[in-house]
Amino acid sequence: MTTTELVVLLHLASPALPIGAYSYSQGLEAALDANLIRDADSARDWIASGLTDVLAHGELPFLAHQLARWQTHDTHALAAENAWFVASRESAELRRETEQMGWSLAQLCASLEWGDAARRATLASLSPIALPTAFAYAAAAHDAGADATLAAYAFGWVENQTSAALKAVPLGQLAGQRIIVALRGAIDAAVRRALATPPDAVNTFAPQLGILSARHETQYSRLFRS
């Protein structure tokens, strides 16, 4: 990995990226309301389960395949798989989340003129656009490798989930850092699993997450949009 590639992926994984990630908990707040999360240990277990049982089977391998599609500029597969992923979201909130963040990242890529004109035109044609599709575009525009791209995406997801737990449980800063440290190995394992997953084995089935997310839509008191 070059220094430039590292800096690009640190940029994409940064919580300062203006795509609104901080406003979503992806079901964590609903899990707290359902008493599935009570403290730092249960928060760590919930985030670990989301990483290994959901992200590693669905979002991460999907990201890897979309990265390959951008690299070869396979416009038909890009559009078809992007539409499939958006349709696979388990609730209205989760669908709006990936669409809003995907749109924001796509707008950022266009404004910064990342990628060549032909690929930018393809990016603009995808509406709605899922976050992993836009993230894959940004990585491909800088020639980032698949393993590092997936690691950056997974770390950003873990960091955002941890930040949501800090606010919602609530937890202290040290507890949050312990969660991130504890999940380093799980991130590596999730990336390796995702890279070994063929396109026809990508699986976004997550019934518990879907039910909790649907409940969150009518939850009485909420900090987050999902």
From Swiss-Prot:
What GO cellular component entries does it have? cytoplasm
Domain of life the protein comes from: Bacteria
Compartmental location = Cytoplasm
Q: Which UniProt keywords apply?
A: Chaperone, Cytoplasm, Nickel insertion
Gene3D superfamilies reported in the protein's UniProt record: Urease accessory protein UreF
GO MF terms listed in the record are: nickel cation binding
Q: Which family does it belong to?
A: Belongs to the UreF family.
> Subunit structure, briefly?
UreD, UreF and UreG form a complex that acts as a GTP-hydrolysis-dependent molecular chaperone, activating the urease apoprotein by helping to assemble the nickel containing metallocenter of UreC. The UreE protein probably delivers the nickel.
Q: What does this protein do?
A: Required for maturation of urease via the functional incorporation of the urease nickel metallocenter.
Protein name in the entry:
Urease accessory protein UreF
Protein source organism: Burkholderia orbicola (strain MC0-3)
